[in-house]
A protein has these predicted regions:
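Conserved ABC ATPase "signature" region
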Residues: 133-152, 393-411, 520
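Conserved ABC transporter NBD signature motif
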Residues: 69-81, 335-346
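Conserved catalytic motifs of ABC-family nucleotide-binding domains
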Residues: 178, 437
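ABC ATPase NBD coupling module
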Residues: 22, 69, 82-99, 125, ...
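Conserved ABC ATPase signature
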Residues: 156-161, 165, 416-420, 424
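Helix-to-loop junction immediately C-terminal to a conserved catalytic motif
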Residues: 61, 65, 327
C-alpha cells in the first residue's frame, strides 16, 4: 500500500469554556484520535454535534476556531507534520494542498464579488495557475459539477444563484487549486432533499474524476455511506469505531454505531380520521405585502384531532408561508381558516385569547425561540400565568408535571437555555406549547437542526404526547424519513400549490406525480451503491427525454 496522504496520530484538542457563574477554564474536546487517509480515498467522519468532527477536519489544516487549540499529537500531510510547520508553510498548505468546503456557502462567499473572482482566488494566489488558466479550469469544474451555463455562471454574484448551485460553486472553489485533500464539512446539511442529492452526486463524481482525497463530515450516516471508502464514528471527542463503509453499515460492532444505523425505526400506524376536523384550510391564496405575486394558490387541507398532517416540500414551496397564514401572521388574499368549529380572523390582532391558546407553534431554532435570560421554569410557566392565571405552588406543580412529560424532570427547572443541549432546548419549547393545553400545534422543521439520534427522541416524544393529550400536529418538514415516521396524512407542496394530498399510505404509494416521485427517490438510503443507482437512473431518464 502507498504512503498515506495524511496520518493523524494521538490528536488532542482543547477549548476554553465559559460556564454561567464560573470562571473560564480549559477542557479537552478531542481525546487522542488517530487515523490514516490514502491518496484518492474518502474518509467519512460521523457523529452528533459536539463529537469533534469539524474540529478534527480543521486540524488537517493546522487550524482551530476561536478558543480552540491543538494541544498534542501529530498531523502529517504529504510527509511532514504540519503542526510543527512555520506559518508561511501553513499558509501555502491552506487553499493549496488542503482546501475546505463549509456547510453554508452563502455565508462563505463575498456578496460583493462575482463568483468567478472568488473561485479562482486561491489557485492564483498559491501560484498554481495564471488567472486565465484558473478561469479555464473553473469553467471545466462548473461543467463537471452540473452547473447551468458553465461558461458564464462565474459572472454572476452569489445571490443570483440557488443554494444548491452556490454549494457546487464552493466545491469548484475547493477543487480549483488542484489540492491533494478537500475537507467537506456538512456540505449538504442545509439543503433540501432534492437539492442535496444533486450536490451529493456532483461531489461524488468530482472526487472520482479529480482523484482528490477527502474528509467528509456529516451527522447523516446514509449520506456518508454514499461517498466514503471508510467511516470513523466519533462521540464526545473519542473514536468509537473505524472501518470500511460496508462493515460500519452492515455489521457495526459498537452499541452507539448500532444506534446510528437503526435510527428512524419509528413505526406509526395511520389513524382513521374523526368526523369533524379541528382545522380546515379553505381555498387559501396569499401574497406578501408589497409584492404582485401569489405565494400560495388555492390551498385546501384538513387536520383532525389527535392526528398529524405532514406538510412536505422543498424550500420556497410554501410550507412555512401556510403556517404564517394559519397563525394569523400573514392575512390571506382569498379563502378562510376554520378552527375548532369557528372561522378564525385572518389577522392576528382580531383573534381572541382562546384562539391563541388553542393554536400553538414550535419553531425550528429553539435557541432563538427562548429568552436566554429566563430559566426553564419561567419559560414554561409564562403560558400557565397568561392563559390560566396560575401562581405559586399550583404553577410550580404544573411546571414539574410538564418537565416530567418531556422526560427532563424537576432538576431542569432552574437552568438557563445556555446550559441545555439542542434536544433539551427543543423539549422545553414542546413543554411551553403544551402548557397552553392547545388543540393543535404547528411544528415548523422542529427536528431539522438536530442530530439523527436526538431528532429520533423528539419524534418519539411528540407521538407519545399526542396519545396522552390528543393534540393535533401540523408538521412542516422537508425530511421524508420524518414524514414516514409520524404522519397520518400528507400534503406535498410545490411552488405554493398542494401537489398531492391524502392519507400516508395513499400519498407514499404509486402512481406518483413527477415531483412527489423526485422527492421520494431523493431520500438517501443506508445501503451501498444507492447513489450510483440514482445517478444511473436519472441519466437514463434524461437521455430518454
Amino acid at each position: 500500500m502507498s504512503e498515506p496522504l495524511m496520518k493523524v496520530r494521538n490528536l488532542k484538542i482543547g477549548a476554553t469554556v465559559y460556564p454561567p457563574g464560573e470562571k473560564p477554564h480549559d477542557i479537552e474536546i478531542v481525546h487522542g484520535v488517530s487515523f490514516d487517509l490514502q491518496p484518492g480515498k474518502v474518509l467519512g467522519l460521523i457523529g452528533e454535534s459536539g463529537a469533534g468532527k469539524s474540529t478534527i477536519g480543521l486540524a488537517s489544516m493546522a487550524y482551530g476556531r476561536g478558543g480552540v487549540k491543538i494541544t498534542g499529537g501529530e498531523v502529517w500531510v504529504n510527509g511532514r507534520d504540519i503542526l510543527q510547520s512555520k506559518l508561511r508553510d501553513i499558509r501555502r498548505l491552506r487553499g493549496g494542498e488542503v482546501t475546505y468546503v463549509s456547510q453554508s456557502a452563502a455565508a462563505s462567499f463575498n456578496p460583493a464579488k462575482k463568483i468567478m473572482e472568488q473561485v479562482i482566488e486561491a489557485a492564483v494566489e498559491q501560484g498554481k495557475f495564471s488567472k486565465k488558466d484558473a478561469e479555464a479550469r473553473a469553467r471545466v469544474l462548473f461543467a463537471k459539477l452540473g452547473l447551468p451555463d458553465p461558461d458564464n455562471i462565474g459572472e454572476r454574484y452569489p445571490h443570483q444563484v440557488s443554494g444548491g448551485q452556490l454549494q457546487r460553486c464552493m466545491t469548484a472553489l475547493a477543487l480549483c487549486p488542484e489540492p491533494d485533500l478537500v475537507v467537506f464539512d456538512e456540505p449538504t446539511t442545509a439543503l433540501d432533499v432534492t437539492t442535496q442529492i444533486e450536490v451529493l452526486m456532483a461531489i461524488k463524481e468530482a472526487i472520482r474524476d479529480t482523484g482528490v482525497a477527502a474528509l467528509y463530515i456529516t451527522h447523516d450516516l446514509a449520506v456518508v455511506a454514499q461517498v466514503s471508502d471508510d467511516i470513523m464514528v466519533l462521540r464526545h471527542g473519542n473514536m468509537v469505531e473505524y472501518g470500511p463503509v460496508d462493515q460500519i453499515i452492515n455489521a457495526p460492532q459498537e452499541e452507539y454505531t448500532q444506534a446510528l444505523v437503526s435510527v428512524r425505526s419509528i413505526t406509526h400506524e395511520e389513524k382513521a380520521p374523526t368526523p369533524e376536523p379541528v382545522l380546515s384550510v379553505r381555498n387559501i391564496t396569499a401574497r406578501y405585502k408589497g409584492t404582485k405575486f401569489d405565494v400560495l394558490h388555492n390551498v385546501n387541507v384538513d387536520l383532525h384531532p389527535g392526528q398529524t398532517l405532514a406538510v412536505v416540500g422543498e424550500s420556497g414551496s410554501g410550507k412555512s408561508t401556510l403556517a404564517r397564514v394559519i397563525t394569523g401572521l400573514l392575512p390571506p388574499r382569498e379563502g378562510e381558516i376554520e378552527f375548532a368549529g369557528r372561522t378564525l380572523s385572518s389577522d392576528l390582532a382580531g383573534r381572541t385569547r382562546e384562539d391563541l391558546r388553542e393554536l400553538q407553534m414550535i419553531y425550528q431554532m429553539a435557541d432563538v425561540a427562548m429568552n436566554p435570560r429566563q430559566t426553564v421554569g419561567t419559560i414554561i410557566g409564562r403560558p400557565l400565568e397568561f392563559y390560566f392565571g396560575m401562581k405559586g405552588a399550583e404553577k410550580r406543580k404544573r411546571i414539574i408535571e410538564l418537565l416530567d412529560e418531556i422526560e427532563l424532570g424537576e432538576s431542569f427547572m432552574d437552568r438557563y437555555p445556555a446550559e441545555l443541549s439542542g434536544g433539551q432546548k427543543q423539549r422545553v419549547c414542546i413543554a411551553r406549547a403544551l402548557a397552553a393545553k392547545p388543540k393543535m400545534i404547528i411544528c415548523d422543521e422542529v427536528t431539522s437542526a438536530l442530530d439523527p439520534l436526538v431528532a429520533d427522541g423528539i419524534l418519539k416524544l411528540l407521538l407519545e404526547l399526542q396519545k396522552i393529550e390528543n393534540v393535533a400536529f401540523l408538521f412542516i418538514t422537508h425530511d421524508l424519513a420524518t414524514v414516514r415516521a409520524i404522519s397520518d396524512n400528507i400534503a406535498v407542496m410545490y411552488q405554493g400549490r398542494v401537489q398531492r394530498y391524502g392519507g400516508k399510505t395513499e400519498v407514499l404509494s404509486p402512481p406518483f406525480d413527477d415531483y412527489t416521485d423526485l422527492l421520494l427517490s431523493s431520500v438517501p438510503e443506508m445501503r451501498l451503491g444507492w447513489l450510483e443507482e440514482v445517478i444511473a437512473n436519472r441519466k437514463m431518464e434524461s437521455a430518454g427525454n
